[in-house]
């Protein structure tokens, strides 16, 4: 029998009154073997919506593509952008339909719509939980401890971004299968924008 192999990744999301921050580290690992330090785990769906994920890169990319195509189709047909909950529900249905051969990915759906900012946490079977902040993946316990200690509902989006980076750095330092730099997406009323935080590599 083959030995069990952990798929490493850590992603976090933080919601504020101004918007949402999604962030993930960039290392792609298989067990304790690093395949790449430039893996993309944060994806912009449109200028109001993005996802961050932990799991297998191929499954993350597939889910992101499904969401992008359906968001665009909805916008073309309805002449308006879909709500965050509508897109999360669609993704939930897709993931649940594969429950006997599930996607190996946990997903954070973040965005802003007419009802305000939203952060939705999804497990590989598509369960939906809306929360103010969350962490997924192998470094989740380390990251969530940092966010728990510093999160404030009235914090600024800039402070939320700093907290997300701080949480991921904590995970990167102690989780052997997380690492590389950090990709972020910041979503507010002005749109969604990507940023990258490069980290010093310690050997």
Swiss-Prot record:
Active-site annotation: 10 (nucleophile)
Main localization category: cytoplasm
Gene3D superfamilies given in the database record: Glutamine Phosphoribosylpyrophosphate, subunit 1, domain 1
Cellular component, GO annotation: cytoplasm; proteasome core complex, beta-subunit complex
Taxonomy, superkingdom: Archaea
Residues cleaved off as propeptide: 1-9
Recorded coiled-coil stretches: none
EC numbers, comma separated: 3.4.25.1
GO BP field: proteasomal protein catabolic process
Keyword Protease: yes
Any GO MF annotation of the entry: threonine-type endopeptidase activity
Keywords, ordered alphabetically: Autocatalytic cleavage, Cytoplasm, Hydrolase, Protease, Proteasome, Threonine protease, Zymogen
Localisation per UniProt entry: Cytoplasm
Reaction catalysis annotation: Cleavage of peptide bonds with very broad specificity
Control of this protein's activity: The formation of the proteasomal ATPase PAN-20S proteasome complex, via the docking of the C-termini of PAN into the intersubunit pockets in the alpha-rings, triggers opening of the gate for substrate entry. Interconversion between the open-gate and close-gate conformations leads to a dynamic regulation of the 20S proteasome proteolysis activity.
Cross-referenced InterPro entries: Ntn_hydrolases_N (IPR029055), Pept_T1A_Psome_bsu_arc (IPR019983), Pept_T1A_subB (IPR000243), Proteasome_sua/b (IPR001353), Proteasome_suB-type (IPR023333)
Assembly with partners or alone: The 20S proteasome core is composed of 14 alpha and 14 beta subunits that assemble into four stacked heptameric rings, resulting in a barrel-shaped structure. The two inner rings, each composed of seven catalytic beta subunits, are sandwiched by two outer rings, each composed of seven alpha subunits. The catalytic chamber with the active sites is on the inside of the barrel. Has a gated structure, the ends of the cylinder being occluded by the N-termini of the alpha-subunits. Is capped at one or both ends by the proteasome regulatory ATPase, PAN.
Function: Component of the proteasome core, a large protease complex with broad specificity involved in protein degradation.
Annotated family: Belongs to the peptidase T1B family.
Entries under NCBIfam families matching the protein: arc_protsome_B
Stated name of the protein: Proteasome subunit beta 2
Species name: Pyrobaculum calidifontis (strain DSM 21063 / JCM 11548 / VA1)
Phylogenetic placement of the source organism: Archaea, Thermoproteota, Thermoprotei, Thermoproteales, Thermoproteaceae
